[in-house]
Swiss-Prot record:
Residues 20-78 are annotated as: Leucine-zipper. This is Caveolae-associated protein 3. Residues 135-203 are annotated as: Interaction with CAV1. It comes from Homo sapiens (Human). Regulates the traffic and/or budding of caveolae. Plays a role in caveola formation in a tissue-specific manner. Required for the formation of caveolae in smooth muscle but not in the lung and heart endothelial cells. Regulates the equilibrium between cell surface-associated and cell surface-dissociated caveolae by promoting the rapid release of caveolae from the cell surface. Plays a role in the regulation of the circadian clock. Modulates the period length and phase of circadian gene expression and also regulates expression and interaction of the core clock components PER1/2 and CRY1/2.
């Protein structure tokens, strides 16, 4: 209203050199007051706008803080998920390695099981009642004797050792075989003594057989042969029946042959 009042009409200007009219002064003051009021109103509007802007800025700042906090929580969650994923991958690798080791162990166990099954079948074949392996197959073979040892051992000892090595033969068959071999040896000694010609020897004593003297004649040999035959007949069978492995009988027979020669 004041502006309208001020703008109603043109203000009459005072003369250049004359006194200023009071109405002009009042109008000028009113214009200045109106301008100051408008300026204050504008400043208030600007202040209100600035307050609104400050509130919006504060709201934006709070939103940014919440966003940063959510980002922090998200980053922590992602870090935990990554750590869990690494642990899961390590557990998966360990489980795979264990599976590989178990597969190798299973293969070894299968191989051992196959060997055990094969050995079990072999034992079944070995110890089967119908076809049982004789005990002589598991005995250690005797060491071979040299020529010197064989020469020292008598023929009866060799026969006795051969008889003892065969465990499957009964005792009666061994005794019969030894008796038969003894009789054969006696017969061979008889033939050897009857076929050889030389000086007659005195009848042998049981302690030591006598040696032949150089002055004996060859004519007395036929007379001494009947005396030798009855002495040699009973001795070898008795020795073979009582103790077939005794070396005295073989040595005595060899000494008798040397004495006859």
């Amino acid at each position: 209203m004041r502006e309208s009042a001020l703008e109603r009409g043109p203000v009459p200007e005072a003369p250049a050199g004359g006194p200023v009219h009071a109405v002009t002064v009042v109008t000028l003051l009113e214009k200045l007051a109106s301008m100051l009021e408008t300026l204050r109103e504008r400043q208030g509007g600007l202040a209100r706008r600035q307050g609104g802007l400050a509130g919006s800025v504060r709201r934006i700042q709070s939103g940014l803080g919440a966003l940063s906090r959510s980002h922090d929580t998200t980053s922590n969650t992602l870090a935990q998920l990554l750590a869990k994923a690494e642990r899961v991958s390590s557990h998966a690798n360990a489980a795979q390695e264990r599976a590989v080791r178990r597969a190798a162990q299973v293969q070894r166990l299968e191989a051992n099981h196959g060997l055990l099954v094969a050995r079990g079948k072999l034992h079944v074949l070995l110890f089967k009642e119908e076809g049982e392996v004789p005990a002589s197959a598991f005995q250690k073979a005797p060491e071979p004797l040299g020529p010197a040892d064989q020469s020292e051992l008598g023929p009866e000892q060799l026969e006795a050792e051969v008889g003892e090595s065969s465990d499957e033969e009964p005792v009666e068959s061994r005794a019969q075989r030894l008796r038969r071999t003894g009789l054969q040896k006696v017969q061979s000694l008889r033939r050897a003594l009857s076929g050889r010609k030389g000086p007659a020897a005195p009848p042998p004593t049981p302690v030591k057989p006598p040696r032949l003297g150089p002055g004996r004649s060859a004519e007395a040999q036929p007379e001494a042969q009947p005396a030798l035959e009855p002495t040699l007949e009973p001795e070898p069978p008795q020795d073979t029946e009582e103790d077939p492995g005794r070396p005295g009988a073989a040595e005595e027979a060899l000494l008798q042959m040397e004495s006859v020669a």
